[in-house]
Amino acid sequence: MKKNKWHLHRAGVLNFWYYDEEEFYFADGKLLLRGSNGSGKSVTMQSLIPVLLDGKKSPDRLDPFGSRARKMEDYLLGEKNVVAREERTGYLYLEYKREGVEQYLTTGIGLRAKRYSNLESWYFVLYDNRRIGRELFLYEPSFSMEDGKEQKIPLSRKQLENRVGNGGRVVKTQNEYLELVNKHLFGFENPDSYEELVKLLIQLRSPKLSKDFKPTVIYEILTNALPSLSDEELRPLTDTIENMDQTQQQLDQ
């Protein structure tokens, strides 16, 4: 068994949905969110996973039932008749920790939304052991003259690039982010295999899994999620079959 595996250690949000800034700690890679129906457990979890695994932010990713009713920018800006907000910048991130050692790695997404405009996003991986909210902050502190309170102004993409420096990567596209997460955390030989893993997680999280999927369908889902074998891995089997064929031919003669 491989030692020192990465475990989910902490999740964080800044300026997203009803959160100004919040952290959620995992225990041995597990997180329990408690609350009454409608308190936001599902929205919080689905805004983090699987979004932060591959960077895809389509509406069906944010709803376990696959609904496309609400977009990521809706959660960032809030409902217009409830919140008088026309633009907002926020961050989502996941922090991983090596088992048994003080080694950390963080993956995250920056989001900027304007009412009636397309969502802007950028992605980052922090791999020099700095931690969000400790050695690196996703905001710039500012003092408000109006209410006399300190404000936290989220960093722009350029500001984040300057903060991260050589201790990580800040990229502009979802595909680049997916490849970085796979490279630094999961180690699949190709991104396609990693994408299949994420698809499997999405299928298995369905609240109606036991109702809608027969055992044969679940078997098919799990089978399709298995990585394909390379020619090198198949060679011993093909060699054995060829040897068996040759032996049979010799016996027949």
Predicted features and spans:
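Extreme N-terminal "head/tail" segments of very large remodeling/mechanoenzyme assemblies
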Residues: 1-160, 191-192, 200, 221, ...
